[in-house]
Amino acid sequence: MNSLEQAEDLKAFERRLTEYVSCLQPTTGRWRMLLIVVSVCTATGAWNWLIDPETQKVSFFTSLWNHPFFTISCITLIGLFFAGIHKRVVAPSIIAARCRTVLAEYNMSCDDTGKLILKPRPHVQ
């Protein structure tokens, strides 16, 4: 394979990688916004639950029943983590890290957007 074909292959690989990473960005942004909203709701509900004087006087389950906003938001947050939201919010970083691992064998790397970084060849003496 001559160097022109190799360069074309590298360019095609880089285009495909940047395309894939950029296609993940909108979805990742939506998952991040959902996680932020549910986290803020859970924190707000937890604050209201903790400062309520009735919380100390009643049983735990009665206290949760008296604070449905906190209960629902907490269950939603737990459900999101079981559904894998912690992986979805960092999906482009995971893809880039895995590509870096593979590309390291070929003296290459890539940034978080998928652009290839060519490293100089090691000099053998």
UniProtKB/Swiss-Prot annotation:
Membrane topology note: Multi-pass membrane protein
GO biological process: lipid metabolic process; positive regulation of triglyceride biosynthetic process
Subcellular location: Nucleus membrane; Cytoplasm
Example of a GO MF term: protein phosphatase regulator activity
GO cellular component, one term: nuclear membrane
TM stretches of this protein: 33-53, 65-85
Keywords annotated in UniProt: Cytoplasm, Lipid metabolism, Membrane, Nucleus, Transmembrane, Transmembrane helix
Chain's role: May form with the serine/threonine protein phosphatase ctdnep1 an active complex dephosphorylating and activating lipins. Lipins are phosphatidate phosphatases that catalyze the conversion of phosphatidic acid to diacylglycerol and control the metabolism of fatty acids at different levels. May indirectly modulate the lipid composition of nuclear and/or endoplasmic reticulum membranes and be required for proper nuclear membrane morphology and/or dynamics. May also indirectly regulate the production of lipid droplets and triacylglycerol.
Family (UniProt): Belongs to the CNEP1R1 family.
Protein's name according to its UniProt entry: Nuclear envelope phosphatase-regulatory subunit 1
UniProt source species: Xenopus laevis
